[in-house]
C-alpha cells in the first residue's frame, strides 16, 4: 500500500532564490524551556520579517515532552521532568545522544501545507539516513521515520526519528529528533508517541550497529535539508 505522503510533490518547499536559511549548531546542551522560549521569539520575528529562517541543531538534557495529543497515562515512570508543549503529537523523550533539529521556516513563502511540510521533513530524515545505508520508511498511520527489524520477528519495526511541529502565522517551529546514540531505556518510561503495539519499538543508529557520531549526522542532515528546502548559511550561536 502506497503511503499517501509519498505521493506529495515536495519540490515546492525550496525557498526563493537567494534565500539562504541560517544553520546553527549548539555544542552544549540546551534546557528545553529555554529552547522553547527562543523558538517562540524567533518564529514571531520571522513572521514579522525581522529575522531570517533558521535550522537549529542541539541536544537537550534528559526531558519528556508532551504534545497536544498527549495523555497523562503516556508517562509510565516520571524519571525526568515532563514539559507540555504546543507541538503536534504525544509524549516523547529528548536527551543526550539525540540530534534535535528545530526548523523555523516561513511556509507562507514556500508552501502553506502542513501535511506536505511533515512529508518534507520525513523526506529530509530519510535522505539523512540513506547516507549511512539505513533505509528509513514512512508509515501511513504513524508519523516519523521507521526501520524494519526482521531480526526481532516478522512485522517488527523501530522508530528512529520523531517529528513534531507547530505553526504560528505559517511559520514553523519545533521539528525533528534523530536517535544517534541516546539511552534507549528512557523510552521505556513512556508510551512513545502513543504507539502501544509491542511490534513497534525505538532504535538508534548506534543500536543498529553503526559507529556514527552527532557530527556525522549533522553533515548528512545539512545536505539532506538543502536537497529538500534549499540553501543554508552558517550562523553563529546565540544565547537561548
Curated annotation (Swiss-Prot):
Instruction: Give me the Gene Ontology terms describing cellular component.
Output: cytoplasm
HAMAP family noted in UniProt? LipB (MF_00013)
Per the UniProt record, which EC number(s) apply here? 2.3.1.181
The protein's organism comes out as Bradyrhizobium sp. (strain BTAi1 / ATCC BAA-1182)
Q: Where in the cell is it found?
A: Cytoplasm
* Other facts noted in the record for this chain: In the reaction, the free carboxyl group of octanoic acid is attached via an amide linkage to the epsilon-amino group of a specific lysine residue of lipoyl domains of lipoate-dependent enzymes.
The reactions it catalyses are: octanoyl-[ACP] + L-lysyl-[protein] = N(6)-octanoyl-L-lysyl-[protein] + holo-[ACP] + H(+)
Sequence ranges assigned to domain BPL/LPL catalytic in this UniProt record? 49-233
Biological processes annotated in GO: protein modification process
Which Pfam families did the record assign? LplA-B_cat
Question: Mind telling me which residues the site (Lowers pKa of active site Cys) is annotated on?
Answer: 159
Which Gene3D superfamilies does the entry mention?
Bira Bifunctional Protein, Domain 2 (3.30.930.10)
Q: Where does substrate bind?
A: 87-94, 162-164, 175-177
Q: What does this protein do?
A: Catalyzes the transfer of endogenously produced octanoic acid from octanoyl-acyl-carrier-protein onto the lipoyl domains of lipoate-dependent enzymes. Lipoyl-ACP can also act as a substrate although octanoyl-ACP is likely to be the physiological substrate.
Residues forming the catalytic site = 193
What name does the UniProt record give this protein?
Answer: Octanoyltransferase
The pathway it acts in is: Protein modification; protein lipoylation via endogenous pathway; protein N(6)-(lipoyl)lysine from octanoyl-[acyl-carrier-protein]: step 1/2
Q: Which spans are transmembrane here? A: none
MF terms in GO: lipoyl(octanoyl) transferase activity
Keywords (A to Z) from UniProt: Acyltransferase, Cytoplasm, Transferase
